[in-house]
Amino acid sequence: QKKDKKDKF
């Protein structure tokens, strides 16, 4: 799992 600005999981 990557921490992206778009993905907030």
Swiss-Prot record:
Main location: secreted
Residue intervals passing through the bilayer: none
Keyword Secreted: yes
Keywords attached to this entry: Pyrrolidone carboxylic acid, Secreted
Full protein name: Tachykinin-like peptide-IV
Localization (cell): Secreted
Tissue/organ expression: Expressed by the venom gland.
Family: Belongs to the tachykinin family.
Gene Ontology cellular-component annotations: extracellular region
The keyword Hydrolase is annotated on this UniProt entry: no
Modified positions (Pyrrolidone carboxylic acid) in chain numbering: 1
